[in-house]
Amino acid sequence: MKTLSCIFLLSLFCGQAHSLEESSFCKALVPGEYILPAEDGTWTWCMAPIYDEKGKLHIFNSVIPKKGSWIKHSKIVHWVADQPEGPYTFVEDLFSSDDASYHNPQVSMAGDTYVLVFLLNRYRDANGSKQEVGMATAKSLDGPWTESPLNPVIPASGEMNGCQIVHASNPTFVVTPEGKYRIYYKSMTDKLPLKKGFREISFAESDQIEGPYVNYEANPVISYADQQVDIEDPYAFFYEGMYYMIVEDRRGVQNLLEGNPIPADQIRNGGYRPGLIYKSKDGINWGVPEIGYQTNEIYFGDKLARSERPNILWKDGKPECLFLACHDEDPTAGYFLKIKNWNVE
C-alpha cells in the first residue's frame, strides 16, 4: 500500500489523475426498496442477508434504542422473509447484553457452518471500551449460535507499522481458494489520537474458522491515512477467480484519486458519496478502485443520506442483491439494489 501511495502522489505531480470509472458492478445495480422500518423508540442499521438451504431469506441487523448509543447498547436481531421485498418476520434478539454492544454483523457460509462476524464492544471490561471483532457460528441459521471462545477473534491490540493497534471493527469474512479463512476489517492505530485517526483496511487469517486469527504482517492493505482521508465498511468476496472489496468512501477518497481533494475542513464524514469497489488477484494488492455504487439520491430521488455497510445477498453462487444501510429521514434499516446481469470484467 505504501508503494501505491507513492505511485498515486507521483501521478498527481505529473498531472496524470483521471476520473474514477463506473464499475461493471455499479452498472448492474437496479433500485429495489427500503426495508425493515424501525420500531418506535429505536433506530436500525446494517443488514446481513443470506438464504438458507430451503430458500428462506434471513437477515441479521443492528437495533439501537434512541435513548442509548450503538457503542454501548446495540444488539443483533434476526428476521426472516420469503423475498428481499419482505414482509419480514421478527425471529429473536440474537445477541444482546448489558455488558457489551453487538453491532454491524456480516454473515457467510463456510462448508456446513454459518459464520457471523460483528463489531464487539465489551465496554465494561478493562480494555478501555475498544471496538474489536467478534464471531459466532452455527450449523443452522435458526441456531443455536455459539460465540467463539476466542472472542474477540481480532482484538484491538498488537503492532502495525510500528504503531499500536487501538481499533478493530466492521469485519467481513472470506474463504480463500486455498481453504484458509480471512477476516478483513477496519483498523486504526495510535499513530494519531483516536479521534483524529484515519480508518484503514487490514486482514487476519486462520487455518480454522474459529481461529486463532493472525494479522497479515504488512497490514494495512488499503490505506489513505497519509493523505488524511479514509474508507471503511469493507465487504469482501471471492468470485470468478478474483477478490473484490466494496467499501464506503467516508472522507472523499474518490476526490483525492481524481486529483481534486476536498479541503479537510469541508469534508462531510460518512457515506454521502458513491461507494468504491476494488479488485485483486490475491486479496492483498488492491490497486485503484472504481465506483462501486451510487447514492440513495441517485437510485430513489430522495434527499441525500448516508449509504453505508454494503452486504451482498447470494443465490446459487451468484450475487442477487446489494444491501446498504441508510440514515434517511424515514427510519429504516436501509435499502437493497438488485444486481442484474453483472458483466464481470
What is the predicted function of each stretch?
Residues 1-4, 18-19:
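Short, Lys/Arg-enriched, disordered terminal segments
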Residues 3-13:
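Sec-dependent N-terminal signal peptides
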Residues 18-345:
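Carbohydrate-active catalytic/glycan-binding domains of CAZyme proteins
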